[in-house]
Structure formats: structure tokens, C-alpha cells
């Protein structure tokens, strides 16, 4: 669905055409087809897309095995960085903002194909529920626990002050649903990233 800003007809048509060009260009990259949709008027522009598809082999979250490594295809941090930017755009330098945009525009198709070639048992995307929720689901489904080391290498931006101060919508719910299932050995300054909602986040492999 497309949320089109309240405007005159010609301007509304411009937004419609502009949005659809962008949506179609991304769909083509992932060998997808836009088959239906609707639009409505709103105070702010917005795009919501629902993806449907078929699969040749079913992969569940219960197939993890002891001793396997955990891999993230991209760094984390879109949630709190966008929250900081919308609060005050000057909190992010132009370089940091462009870096954020580059990662948000980077798809997961290629890494997904690589994952399949290595016969990865589990591949799931880190979404608005955050890393902790997705990893916890895998552990519970597989009857295992996981150990991860939080360091700045998993962050898009290593400004710890911003990470500690800003939280996007969804952080509170993510924390309340997952925090009691996680044990943090030390008071790690990066722990908020576990519950940070991701937009076009990485694959957890």
C-alpha cells in the first residue's frame, strides 16, 4: 500500500509514479513482481509491501546444532540511528547518514544465495523484533543456548552515546519480551543493540 501526502491531483500523481518506479526497480532486482495494491491519503508518505512466495525446501528454526557458528550478513543499528536522526538530524554527520542509507538499501539476495550454497541449516532476517528475539526463537526451537560477544564491529555506527540514549519505536516491547531470556556477563554498553528494531536488517545465519 502507498500512503500519499494530502495534495493536489497532479502532485499526488507525481508521488504515485515516483514511488512505483522505486518499488518496481527493487522488485526486479529480486526477481519479484508487483501484482496488486492500493493507495490512500495520509499526512506523511509511506510504503508497505507484503511479500509472498514459494519454496522448494522447508527450513525451520529448530534445525540448529551444537557447535555451529552464528553469522550476521550486515551490521545492526538502523533503529536507534533513525530515532536519533529524527530527533535531531545534526546528531549524525553526513558521512554517518550516508553510511546508514547504504546499508538500508543493501538487499540480502546475494548473501541468501551464498547461504544456500553452503547448505546453511537456518537463515532468517533480523526484523523489527531485533536480534535477541530472533536468536532466542532459534535457541528455544532447537533446545540450545547461544553465546555471542558484543563488540563495535556489529554496529553501523560506533557512537555508543547515541546507542545508549536513543531508542526507536518497538525497543520497549522487544526488551520486555526478550530480556529475561538473556544473561549478560558484564554491564555491556552495547546491550541495547540486542533489542534494536531493524529496518532491512541483516540475515542471521
Identify the function of each model-found stretch.
Residues 10-33, 40-45, 52, 117-119, ...:
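Glycine-/charge-enriched secondary-structure boundary and capping motifs
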Residues 67, 125, 205:
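Conserved S/T- and glycine-rich ATP-binding loop of Class I adenylate-forming
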Residues 70, 108-111, 116-122, 127-130:
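Internal active-site segments that recognize and position negatively charged phosphoryl groups
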Residues 95-103, 121-122, 190-193:
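Short pre-catalytic strand/loop immediately N-terminal to key active-site residues, enriched for Gly-Thr
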Amino acid at each position: 500500500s502507498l500512503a500519499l501526502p494530502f495534495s493536489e491531483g497532479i502532485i499526488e500523481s507525481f508521488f504515485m509514479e515516483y514511488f512505483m518506479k522505486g518499488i518496481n526497480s527493487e522488485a526486479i532486482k529480486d526477481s519479484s513482481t508487483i501484482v496488486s495494491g492500493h493507495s490512500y491519503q495520509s499526512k506523511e508518505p509511506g510504503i508497505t509491501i507484503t511479500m509472498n512466495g514459494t519454496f522448494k525446501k522447508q527450513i525451520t528454526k529448530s534445525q540448529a546444532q551444537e557447535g555451529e557458528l552464528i553469522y550476521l550478513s550486515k551490521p545492526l543499528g538502523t533503529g536507534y540511528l533513525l530515532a536519533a536522526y529524527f530527533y535531531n538530524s545534526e546528531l549524525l554527520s553526513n558521512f554517518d547518514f550516508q553510511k546508514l542509507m547504504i546499508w538500508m538499501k543493501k538487499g540480502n539476495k546475494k548473501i541468501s544465495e551464498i547461504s544456500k550454497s553452503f547448505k546453511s541449516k537456518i537463515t532468517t532476517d533480523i526484523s523489527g523484533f531485533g536480534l535477541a528475539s530472533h536468536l532466542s526463537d532459534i535457541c528455544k526451537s532447537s533446545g540450545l543456548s547461544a553465546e555471542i560477544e558484543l563488540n563495535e564491529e556489529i554496529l553501523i555506527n560506533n557512537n555508543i552515546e547515541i546507542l545508549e540514549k536513543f531508542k526507536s519505536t518497538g525497543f520497549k516491547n522487544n526488551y520486555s519480551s526478550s530480556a529475561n531470556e538473556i544473561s549478560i556477563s558484564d554491564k555491556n554498553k552495547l546491550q541495547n543493540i540486542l533489542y534494536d528494531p531493524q529496518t532491512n536488517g541483516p540475515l542471521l545465519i
